[in-house]
């Protein structure tokens, strides 16, 4: 998810997207721990998306 897409979301949508993305990240980590997944770089991508969403949410709360 690109930064411009994240900025277009409302605060409620950010919260929802963040929880969904965290669940995907946890599922990927679990799947990779059990047996290596086909594309392990997806874990990094999802982790960075979680960080982007959390950063934007915090930024909005501070304003």
UniProtKB/Swiss-Prot annotation:
GO BP field: translation
Record's keyword annotation contains Zinc-finger: no
Alphabetic keyword roster: Ribonucleoprotein, Ribosomal protein
InterPro entries: Ribosomal_uL29, Ribosomal_uL29_CS, Ribosomal_uL29_sf
SUPFAM superfamilies in the cross-refs: Ribosomal protein L29 (L29p)
Annotated GO CC locations: ribonucleoprotein complex; ribosome
Molecular function in Gene Ontology: structural constituent of ribosome
Entry coiled-coil feature ranges: none
Family: Belongs to the universal ribosomal protein uL29 family.
HAMAP family: Ribosomal_uL29
Protein name: Large ribosomal subunit protein uL29
Gene: rpmC
């Amino acid at each position: 998810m690109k930064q411009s897409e994240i900025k277009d979301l409302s605060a409620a949508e950010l919260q929802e997207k963040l929880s969904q993305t965290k669940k995907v990240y946890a599922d990927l980590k679990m799947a990779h721990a059990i047996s290596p997944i086909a594309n392990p770089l997806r874990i990094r991508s999802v982790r960075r998306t979680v960080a982007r969403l959390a950063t934007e949410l915090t930024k909005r709360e501070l304003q």
